[in-house]
C-alpha cells in the first residue's frame, strides 16, 4: 500500500510531494481567497486577474501586428525614395516638382502639377539627395494658381453682398463704404433683421435716392412731397441719405419708381357702363367690418387701390381726383375689374425706415437650394455684417487698388461655404449654369476649364454649387486653370504691379 501511494505522488510536480490536480486546486483556492478579501465575493463568476492578463496579451499582440505591418509597408513604399509618383515634393525644403518623362521640373503650385500630369495626386515626399540624382528642367506651371484643393459644394448655396457705411462718412462719398462678400449662411443674431413688409432702407447712389425693401431698390424723388408724405418720409431723409456702393447697387434688382402713378387718359370719360366718374376718379366703398376699400376708375373698369396709393393720388390732385367718391358695395360689385397699373412697388402701410446710424450694414442676400426653381432674394440690415462675433477674425481683407466700390474690400467664408461653383444668372428664376470657378480661402476666384480632363486632374468631380455672378465678380480674378495654361515653361515670373505692404508686428 505504501509503495502504491508513493507511486501516485511520483507522477506530480517537483519532488513528487503533490499531484497536478492538487496544484490547480490550490491555485483556485488562492484566487478565491484573494477575491473574498478584495471583493467580498466567492462565487468566482468573474476573475479580474485573468481579464488583466488577457488585456496585456491582446495589447502586446496588436502592437506586434502594427509593427510588422509598418515594416512590410516600408518595403512596399519606402519613405524618402523616388517611385513612380508623378508629383514629388522635397521632404526638407517643401519644393514641388513634376515628373515629365525622365526629367523633374520645378512646379509653381499643386494646381499646375496636377494639370500637367492629369492626375489628382498629392505630392510624394522625397529626400533631397534622391531629387539631386534626377535631371532637371525649367520652372513650369500657371503663376498664381492655387496650391490646395478641398472641394466643398453644399446643396444649399448662400451669397451676400454687404455695404457697411462709416458713420463719419460724408453724404454721397464712397470713401467710408466697405464692401464685403459673404459665402455661406449669414448670422442673424445681434439685432440683425431681414427687411419685410414696410421695413426699408434709404440710400443714395450717384445723384439718385433709392428705397430698398423686399429684395429690390426703387428710385424716389426727394422733392415729390405727394409721394413722400404717404410713405412716411421727409425730404431731409431722402436728400441726406448715406451712400451705396456700386457693388450693392448692381446686386439689388431695380423695381418700379416710387412716384405718382400715371393714369392713362386721366380726366377722359370711362367707357364701361355705370362708371361713377371720369378716368382717374378715386372711389371709396364703406365696409360693414374692416377698413374702407379704395378703387380707381380706368377706361374699361376699376382697379383696387391700396390706401397708401389712394392717398398719393389724392395728394397729387390729378384730373378727376379732387375728392374720393363714395360708392355703395352693391354698385361696385357690378363694375368690371381690371389690373392695368403696376403698384407692386408701393407698401401697404407707411415705411418703417431703418436708422442707418444704428444699422450701418445693408446686405443683399441670395439663397438657393439644389432642386429649387427659384432663388430667394432678401435684404438684411444690422449694426455689423452678418458674421458671428467669434468669426470676425476670419474675415479676409483683400489687396486691391480700386476705391470705386466695384470690387470687394473683404470676404468671409462661413462653415457651410461653397468653393467650387457654377455661375448662374442674376434673375432669381434663372435656370442657367455657366462657367466654373474655384474660390480660394484667400478670396480669389479662378476659372476652371469645363472639361472632364481638367476637372478630373484637379479632383473637382463633384457637382458645383450655384453662385450669382453679381457677387462672384466682386472677388479678384486669377488665371484660368487649364492644361494648356499649365504646360508652359518660365525663366522668371512677372512682378505684381499693385502689391500691398505686409505689416509685421514688432
Swiss-Prot record:
Its main location: membrane. Disulfide bonds join 162-363. The chain crosses the membrane at residues 56-76. NCBIfam families: T7SS_EccB. Part of the eccB5-eccC5 operon, which is essential for in vitro growth. Part of the ESX-5 / type VII secretion system (T7SS), which is composed of cytosolic and membrane components. The ESX-5 membrane complex is composed of EccB5, EccC5, EccD5 and EccE5. This is ESX-5 secretion system ATPase EccB5. The gene is eccB5.
Amino acid at each position: 500500500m505504501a509503495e502504491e501511494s508513493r507511486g501516485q505522488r511520483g507522477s506530480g510536480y517537483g519532488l513528487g510531494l503533490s499531484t497536478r490536480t492538487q496544484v490547480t486546486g490550490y491555485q483556485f483556492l488562492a484566487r478565491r481567497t484573494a477575491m473574498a478579501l478584495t471583493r467580498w465575493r466567492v462565487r468566482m463568476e468573474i476573475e479580474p486577474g485573468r481579464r488583466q492578463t488577457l488585456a496585456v496579451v491582446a495589447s502586446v499582440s496588436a502592437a506586434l501586428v502594427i509593427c510588422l505591418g509598418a515594416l512590410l509597408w516600408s518595403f512596399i513604399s519606402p519613405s524618402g525614395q523616388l517611385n513612380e509618383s508623378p508629383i514629388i515634393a522635397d521632404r526638407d525644403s517643401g519644393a514641388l516638382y513634376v515628373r515629365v518623362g525622365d526629367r523633374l521640373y520645378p512646379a509653381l503650385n499643386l494646381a499646375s502639377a496636377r494639370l500637367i500630369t492629369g492626375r489628382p495626386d498629392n505630392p510624394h515626399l522625397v529626400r533631397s539627395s534622391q531629387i539631386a540624382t534626377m535631371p532637371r528642367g525649367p520652372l513650369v506651371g500657371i503663376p498664381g494658381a492655387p496650391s490646395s484643393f478641398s472641394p466643398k459644394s453644399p446643396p444649399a448655396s448662400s451669397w451676400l453682398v454687404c455695404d457697411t457705411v462709416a458713420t463719419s462718412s460724408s453724404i454721397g462719398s464712397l470713401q467710408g463704404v466697405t464692401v464685403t462678400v459673404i459665402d455661406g449662411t449669414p448670422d442673424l443674431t445681434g439685432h440683425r433683421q431681414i427687411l419685410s413688409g414696410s421695413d426699408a432702407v434709404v440710400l443714395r447712389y450717384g445723384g439718385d435716392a433709392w428705397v430698398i425693401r423686399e429684395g429690390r431698390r426703387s428710385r424716389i424723388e426727394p422733392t415729390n412731397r405727394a409721394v413722400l408724405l404717404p410713405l412716411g418720409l421727409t425730404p431731409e431723409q431722402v436728400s441726406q441719405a448715406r451712400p451705396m456702393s456700386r457693388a450693392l447697387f448692381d446686386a439689388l434688382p431695380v423695381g418700379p419708381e416710387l412716384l405718382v402713378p400715371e393714369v392713362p387718359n386721366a380726366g377722359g370719360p370711362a367707357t364701361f357702363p355705370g362708371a361713377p366718374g371720369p378716368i382717374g376718379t378715386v372711389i371709396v366703398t364703406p365696409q360693414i367690418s374692416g377698413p374702407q376699400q379704395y378703387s380707381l376708375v380706368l377706361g374699361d373698369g376699376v382697379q383696387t387701390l391700396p390706401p397708401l396709393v389712394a392717398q398719393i393720388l389724392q395728394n397729387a390732385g390729378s384730373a378727376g381726383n379732387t375728392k374720393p367718391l363714395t360708392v355703395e358695395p352693391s354698385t361696385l360689385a357690378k363694375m368690371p375689374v381690371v389690373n392695368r397699373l403696376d403698384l407692386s412697388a408701393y407698401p401697404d402701410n407707411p415705411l418703417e425706415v431703418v436708422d442707418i446710424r444704428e444699422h450701418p450694414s445693408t446686405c443683399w442676400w441670395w439663397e438657393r437650394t439644389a432642386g429649387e426653381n427659384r432663388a430667394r432674394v432678401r435684404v438684411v440690415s444690422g449694426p455689423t455684417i452678418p458674421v458671428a462675433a467669434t468669426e470676425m477674425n476670419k474675415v479676409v481683407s483683400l489687396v486691391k487698388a480700386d476705391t470705386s466700390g466695384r470690387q470687394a474690400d473683404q470676404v468671409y467664408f462661413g462653415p457651410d461655404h461653397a468653393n467650387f461653383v457654377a455661375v448662374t444668372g442674376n434673375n432669381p428664376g434663372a435656370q442657367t449654369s455657366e462657367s466654373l470657378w474655384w474660390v480660394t480661402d484667400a478670396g480669389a476666384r479662378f476659372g476652371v476649364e469645363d472639361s472632364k480632363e481638367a476637372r478630373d486632374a484637379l479632383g473637382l468631380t463633384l457637382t458645383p454649387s450655384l453662385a450669382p455672378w453679381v457677387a462672384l465678380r466682386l472677388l479678384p480674378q486669377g488665371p484660368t486653370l487649364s492644361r494648356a495654361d499649365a504646360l508652359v515653361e518660365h525663366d522668371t515670373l512677372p512682378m505684381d504691379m499693385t502689391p500691398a505692404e505686409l505689416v509685421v508686428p514688432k
